[in-house]
């Protein structure tokens, strides 16, 4: 007779106290009405942002800008966590206050970008793999000591039906890399945000995006399972299901809501606490409206919220212009945008926050950061 011993052909379980901490942190990150501020732009990417407002990309200016963001009073009402670039995790403002302390003052959980960028996958037509697994465990330990409680790793795929993209090889590579990263993070008490971004590049229809996104997410969750990742202590950061940027058919926001929700229901286990969408180059306003269209289709088995970078910061940067006298106005803009997205998580955003400038597209082809 077969006894009740545990099945041995399975990954080792996390210690109970670690699993509990991860699950609690993940739930806090997707608390009702809150989302995540993605402020993890690399030094090269923030240079592009600063070039647009004609300020120099110096350590001091980067610290001043992050101080503007994190020092916004009341931000914690709408923002649960902030993803930081490594430099920012250890940085101080002009007054000598660590920037992470500003987040703590608002009850915002610090997180950290841990991937090391993209490289081409051999034997593919420039499809990408993400670097950064080497030494990740040691880095996670240091990030945890510095106050980080979650991490983010971005993988990228492109849709090109004529070239068969994404190939099965690239989907497999992306899925396995995300799963290994997630497992390493959890072993070191960091909640992993799993980001398989399908870029908006291309002229494909929304139906094609739905098919590809479904295939990718199914592969990702299979890999997470195979690597013993605790779903209750992880979050997913996917693209919304939209048509390609160059598609001639204008996509309605209701269709984005329908196809996105259908795709998630077909692929994402309810054990996962939440999904934090990336904005993917949508305008600030579109990112809020489309998130609203997703949430009006609830109730859902997971929290569906936001993890926006450009869609929270574009108008803030344009208002700030690198000038101290504009900091208060820029912070007011950030609060307005954060509140709009908070309302969208309830399906109660009516549109109009930020005026006409919030409708400007933030799309960048082959976006890297």
Swiss-Prot record:
Membrane topology designation: Peripheral membrane protein
Superkingdom classification of source: Eukaryota
Gene3D superfamilies cross-referenced by the UniProt entry: Aldolase class I (3.20.20.70)
Residues engaged in binding beta-D-fructose 1,6-bisphosphate: 49, 279-281, 307, 310
GO biological process, one term: glycolytic process
The keyword ATP-binding appears for this protein: no
Family, per entry: Belongs to the class I fructose-bisphosphate aldolase family.
Name this protein carries in UniProt: Fructose-bisphosphate aldolase 2
Naturally occurring in which organism (per UniProt): Plasmodium berghei (strain Anka)
Gene name of the encoded protein: ALDO2
């Amino acid at each position: 007779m077969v006894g009740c011993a545990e099945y041995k052909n399975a990954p080792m379980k996390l210690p109970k106290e670690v699993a509990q901490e991860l699950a609690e942190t993940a739930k806090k990150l997707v608390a009702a009405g809150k989302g995540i501020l993605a402020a993890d732009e690399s030094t090269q990417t923030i240079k592009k942002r600063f070039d647009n407002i004609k300020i120099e990309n110096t350590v001091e200016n980067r610290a001043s800008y992050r101080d503007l963001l994190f020092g916004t009073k009341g931000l914690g009402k709408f923002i649960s966590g902030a993803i930081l670039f490594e430099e920012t995790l250890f940085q101080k403002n002009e007054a000598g206050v660590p920037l992470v302390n500003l987040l703590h003052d608002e009850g915002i959980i610090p997180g950290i970008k841990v991937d090391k960028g993209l490289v081409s996958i051999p034997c593919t037509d420039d499809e990408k793999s993400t670097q950064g697994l080497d030494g990740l465990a040691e880095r996670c330990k240091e990030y945890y000591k510095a106050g980080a409680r979650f991490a983010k790793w971005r993988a990228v795929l492109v849709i090109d039906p004529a070239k068969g993209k994404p190939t099965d090889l690239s989907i497999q590579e992306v899925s396995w890399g995300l799963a290994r990263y997630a497992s390493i993070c959890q072993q070191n008490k960091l909640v992993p945000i799993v980001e398989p971004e399908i870029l908006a590049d291309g002229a494909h229809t929304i139906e094609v995006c739905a098919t590809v996104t479904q295939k990718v997410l199914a592969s990702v969750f299979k890999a997470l399972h195979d690597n013993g990742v605790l779903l209750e202590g992880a979050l997913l950061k996917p693209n919304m299901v939209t048509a390609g940027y160059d598609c001639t058919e204008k996509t309605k926001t209701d269709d984005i809501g329908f196809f996105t929700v259908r795709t998630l229901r077909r692929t994402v286990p309810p054990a996962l606490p939440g999904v934090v969408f990336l904005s993917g180059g949508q305008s600030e306003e579109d990112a809020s409206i489309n998130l609203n269209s997703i949430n009006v289709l609830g109730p859902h088995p997971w929290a569906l919220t936001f993890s926006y970078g450009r869609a929270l910061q574009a108008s803030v940067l344009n208002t700030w212009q690198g000038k101290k006298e504009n900091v208060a106005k820029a912070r007011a803009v950030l609060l307005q945008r954060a509140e709009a997205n908070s309302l969208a998580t309830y399906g109660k955003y009516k549109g109009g926050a930020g005026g006409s400038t919030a409708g400007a597209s933030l799309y960048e082809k082959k976006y890297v950061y």
